[in-house]
Amino acid sequence: MKIVILLSGGLDSTTVLYLARSLGHDCYALSFNYGQRHKQELAAAIAVAQLAGVIQHQVISFDLGLWGGSALTDYTLDLPQNRAFKEMAEQIPITYVPARNTIFLSFALSYAEAIGATQVYAGMNAIDYSGYPDCRPDYIAAMQEVYRLGTKQGREGEPIQIITPLIDLTKPAIIQLGNRLGVPWAKTWSCYSDGGGNDPPVACGVCDSCRLRLAAFAELSLTDPLPYR
């Protein structure tokens, strides 16, 4: 089956890529250079796409930093550090990028319909949707309706399907799945910083994304292979 995968280069989307590959799908990856401060994630996406042997990897460039509204695209805003996990779950964070997943899923829909793909795979999961409005199941259901109503394939009764295989999984469960699939964790990138200009890049260890990732590995008594400050 021909599918499109939204690939950020992070832990979740890389696991989804390796899962789709294990199912025998023909994988077409789509990544974005959208003005994010953590450019290292794009380098990670390119690396894991090559390792996984995707058929095609498209990188789309545009600048959401033109209007900001997020600490990931507005460099005048500070990234949250050392936040409590309870706080992460209860509030929409300043790292939320306005309508980002709507933009990403729209590009993925266009790409999928153009190449004749039947599904779009994305890495939303239980941890994400506790804090981000565009990672929640009701949002995915609404976008699925857009896919049905807004495309030729959808109107002909064969809408492209949005597949979110991690939607009910916690971060530790995702890591366990990734280990079974042989995901190269050392090639992935989750940090909201750019790696500090180091070679190899070094994750900050204190942003929300780093803390969730580190806690998940620790819960499984595993060592995250990424270097941290």
UniProtKB/Swiss-Prot annotation:
GO biological process, one term: queuosine biosynthetic process
GO molecular function: ATP binding; ligase activity, forming carbon-nitrogen bonds; zinc ion binding
Swiss-Prot/TrEMBL catalytic activity: 7-carboxy-7-deazaguanine + NH4(+) + ATP = 7-cyano-7-deazaguanine + ADP + phosphate + H2O + H(+)
UniProt-annotated binding residues for Zn(2+): C191, C204, C207, C210
Alphabetical keyword list: ATP-binding, Ligase, Metal-binding, Nucleotide-binding, Queuosine biosynthesis, Zinc
Pfam family, any one: QueC
Pathway recorded for this protein: Purine metabolism; 7-cyano-7-deazaguanine biosynthesis
Keyword Transcription carried by entry: no
Cofactor: Zn(2+)
UniProt-listed Enzyme Commission number(s): 6.3.4.20
Entry's cofactor comment: Binds 1 zinc ion per subunit.
Binding positions for ATP per the UniProt entry: L7, S8, G9, G10, L11, D12, S13, T14, T15, V16, L17
Assigned protein family: Belongs to the QueC family.
Function statement: Catalyzes the ATP-dependent conversion of 7-carboxy-7-deazaguanine (CDG) to 7-cyano-7-deazaguanine (preQ(0)).
PANTHER family according to UniProt: 7-CYANO-7-DEAZAGUANINE SYNTHASE (PTHR42914:SF1)
Protein's recorded name: 7-cyano-7-deazaguanine synthase
Higher taxonomy: Bacteria, Bacillati, Cyanobacteriota, Cyanophyceae, Gomontiellales
